[in-house]
């Protein structure tokens, strides 16, 4: 039975009450204080002090200061009046028990509200951090796009300048081609004037020679001005076999591959962006692919909780994309949420059907991640089954082979110990 303390002193004003309680040599670390609206208790073994207050107080503003073997309480009254006494008069045991239980329930409700408020503030902080990160990356993306646009404009200006130079050069060449025949004609005319000034010495056989020279001049001009006609246009029709998968037709499973492609197309159309809870999101935040890339970047920076938030939002938008569950399983593995990693890996395997070459790598990763989670839960037999399923998909993967061999050794060692 604790020893009840009756030695204390108190003073009051209309707004507050001051209570001094000696600890009687007990270490202050062993003192436990509980304060409610109508109930105050201090437990410092082997002593116990409790009082059922005359009127309600504001336990949120009230405070206690411990020091020098004394606890000094400053209790703020809800109604600014002077009390006739510290404790409530005429209180029996049943009423005391009711007041105690009521005070404990009120304290529990306040603690629950404080926990919920703290969790809500934490979620808001995470959302704000994610939004700020998205904003920074959007600014970087815009900056890169502006740089690309400036480079494109610069290249366009340089190309236009080059075209203008080419036009000027072509114009000069055309002028030169036109001037050459005129210069030849003038030279011929000067040569024709010389025999007229000396007719006696001019041989009669030079007239046809002059005619041949004129023919040569015009023939050269025609050769220079003659431009070949453009070639006639033509078109060649080419059609390819519509094969989406790279495997040979004799080795592929056409029906399964078509079913897989059909499921992928349906998954892309299965969006839930019209829900009221998504009305405050930006357009890019409603894109599961954009959220997946965002989660991948957060995973690369080891911010696994934020990555899970991004994958969660993407899954709420579209629940039929297996890679979202696969990536979230990797985050849960990093955070040791092993049961959730198993659930996400199983959901990814459920969506990765039918098994075709296009989803082989994803199925192998899902088996490995689920097997890893089983092994960390010490369920080695189940883990080995997943690793063997992964090896059936990719038999040449040496990492998976080595891990499967280690699991076999662990299982064999456990079996030998049980026999011993």
Curated annotation (Swiss-Prot):
SUPFAM superfamilies in the cross-refs: HSP20-like chaperones, TPR-like
Residue span(s) of domain CS: 3-87
Stored InterPro entries: CS_dom, CS_DYX1C1, Dynein_assembly_factor_4, HSP20-like_chaperone, TPR-like_helical_dom_sf, TPR_rpt
GO cellular component: centrosome; cytoplasm; dynein axonemal particle; extracellular region; neuron projection; non-motile cilium; nucleus
Functional note: Involved in neuronal migration during development of the cerebral neocortex. May regulate the stability and proteasomal degradation of the estrogen receptors that play an important role in neuronal differentiation, survival and plasticity. Axonemal dynein assembly factor required for ciliary motility.
Subunit note: Interacts with ZMYND10. Interacts with STUB1. Interacts with ESR1 and ESR2. Interacts with DNAAF2. Interacts with CCT3, CCT4, CCT5 and CCT8. Interacts with DNAAF6/PIH1D3.
The protein's name: Dynein axonemal assembly factor 4
Name of the encoding gene: Dnaaf4
